[in-house]
Amino acid sequence: RIAWDEKESKTLYYSLKDIQLFIAGLSMSRLHILQGISGTGKTSLPIAFARAVGGGCEIISVQAGWRDKGDLIGHFNAFEKKFYEQATLQALYKAQCPTYADRPYIIVLDEMNISRPEQYFAEFLSALELDPIKRKLTLMTSSQNNAPELLIDGKGIKIPENVWFVGTANHDETTYEFADKTYDRAHLMTLPRHKHTFEVDKTLGPVTFSFSSLEEAFEEASKKHADTVASIIQEMDDSDFLEVLDNEFNVNWGNRFERHLMRFIPVMLECGSNIGIALDHMLATKVLREGKATGRYDTDGENIDNLIEALESFWENCTSLKGKPEACLKLLNQELKKKSQT
C-alpha cells in the first residue's frame, strides 16, 4: 500500500529497512527529519504512509526568511480583530475534527531547513517535549468572540497527540544546519537512492488504522521488550565504548536517548528487524553523527581508531547484537579517512 500510489499512478520503491525505521521512529518522537539527495523520496514517504493507513497529511512548503511561529501558523491582526491563519494551523485544527481525531495525521515541513527551524519551530520543539495534554500553542493574548469551538479558551490551540511533524532536509549552500537540540529530539533518517525495484501488488484495497490502535501497538511492543532494551543500555553504560566516548570525545548520553531507545528498538523488533540494526541506527544518528563525535577539529585519527576498536569490541561481546554496526563504522571510517588527509 505504501509502494503503489493509485491516484498518481506511481510506484515508490522503499526498502523494508526504510519502512521499519520510519514506523519505529513514529513510536519514538513526534518529529522526524528525513535527509537525502534530491529524488530519494523524502517527501513521498510520509505521504505514502499516511495514505496506506488511512490517515491525514498536509504538505507545508517552508519559505526562506521565516523567523517565528507566525510565519508557520499565521498571525492575529489586533486592528482588524482577525486571525490570518496559515495551512499549518488549519492542519492542527483539522487533525482534531471527528474525521481525523482517531487517525494518524502527518504534517510535512518540506525543505524544513531552508529557514532556521530553531526560530520558526521553536515553540513546537518545546511543546512536543511536554506531556500530550500540555502540548498547546498560544495564538493571541486574549480570547475572541465567535472563536472556533476547538480552540483553547478562544485563544490557543492544542497540538493533537495524533499529529507527527516530518521535515525534509537538504544540505547545501541554501540551507541551515540543524541545532543539536533539534537533532536530539527528532528521529533522523537518511534515505538512500533506491536502485532495486520489486513486484508491487496493485490490487490491495484501502484500509484505515486508528491512531489509538497504533499507539496501543507501540505500547505493547515497548512493554514486551523492555527488559531486553534495558539490558542493552546497561551493557553500553558499562562498556569501554562509552568510556572512550566520554574521555576522548566528551560525548555521553542522557535520559532522552535512553527513553528513545526504549521506544524505538521494541518497534523495530516487532517490525521484523533486530536489535543490532536498531541500535546501530540510533548510535549513528544520535551519538556519532557529524558535529557530535565526528566532524570535529579537536580529535585525531588515534581517537577515531580507539573508538572503532571499542565499538567493535562491544558489539562482539554483546550476545544479543547480530552482525556489525555498519552505519556507525561507515561514519567512523569516513572520519578516519578525512583525518588522514589533513
Question: Positions of the model-derived regions?
Answer:
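Alpha-helical lid/collar subdomain of P-loop NTPases
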Residues: 201-342
